[in-house]
Amino acid sequence: MNKIKVAIIFGGCSEEHDVSVKSAIEIAANINTEKFDPHYIGITKNGVWKLCKKPCTEWEADSLPAIFSPDRKTHGLLVMKEREYETRRIDVAFPVLHGKCGEDGAIQGLFELSGIPYVGCDIQSSAACMDKSLAYILTKNAGIAVPEFQMIEKGDKPEARTLTYPVFVKPARSGSSFGVTKVNSTEELNAAIEAAGQYDGKILIEQAISGCEVGCAVMGNEDDLIVGEVDQIRLSHGIFRIHQENEPEKGSENAMIIVPADIPVEERNRVQETAKKVYRVLGCRGLARVDLFLQEDGGIVLNEVNTLPGFTSYSRYPRMAAAAGITLPALIDSLITLAIER
């Protein structure tokens, strides 16, 4: 049987570049090479595409210039060797890219043009989930609770007196808590807006939600969905930003991730059902991690949806899947299969 040629794309221009490299390293270590023939394409922080042997911290050292061709006849890569391009057919693409140009529909559009099946959400659902304000509007219209929020553009000044503190100020289109600030008073607001504006021109100001933060890994296309165990983030202080820490592999500096979540089974079931509803409302396919707040009165409020969650050794999505009995090799296999079947 011929192996399935899988292009695993990692790195990228976003602030989450280093996380993406770590995710690709884990996937490379766990993909079934008896079934799949992986081709690793790294994107530098400056946006240069290169074919490399394997993802690692020094992946650029031994690499060749390569690009995905939008030509459907090529159906794959153009690789520069000895001043000439050679073509490499690809059966399916697995973008392991986080943040802008990875989770926002941009690279998904390239795969659509090229006619190559790809792991994860399509253009529309990727864009909707990446923009937190759009995700809130769509899910609220479907009857899902969301935080009170307002949007401003970079350089605008909100009417501070209309806000009930604390609030969170965050880039509307970013991830891993980059540019996110908890604001407790009017005096802190302008600095928080400036910090968020470094990552996006569209800024979200949302009401802080009391309760615990929980998450749910969802996998599948359309109605046939599989969920992982619910996890729970227990903070000692500050906000959850493990991907910005120096040594996250040794554990978070301010958070404990509990899998399964330390909540009653009935509440875990409700969180899973809410996560599946959010997934369907936003048109997700393949996979997504749905983050929610569980309030003391039992209310469940949407936080955000990550359409290409991390696959690092400390990432939440694979840990939730593992707690439900899905190993990382099996998870990778299932995600590639879902992409081909879609």
Swiss-Prot record:
Manganese as UniProt keyword: yes
Catalytic reaction annotation: (R)-lactate + D-alanine + ATP = D-alanyl-(R)-lactate + ADP + phosphate
Compartments where located: Cell membrane
Presence of keyword ATP-binding: yes
Entry-linked NCBIfam families: D_ala_D_alaTIGR, D_ala_D_lac, D_ala_D_lac_VanB, PRK01966.1-4
Protein name stated in the entry: Vancomycin B-type resistance protein VanB
Up-regulation conditions: By vancomycin.
Function: Required for high-level resistance to glycopeptides antibiotics. D-Ala--D-Ala ligase of altered specificity which catalyzes ester bond formation between D-Ala and various D-hydroxy acids; producing a peptidoglycan which does not terminate in D-alanine but in D-lactate, thus preventing vancomycin binding.
Lineage: Bacteria, Bacillati, Bacillota, Bacilli, Lactobacillales
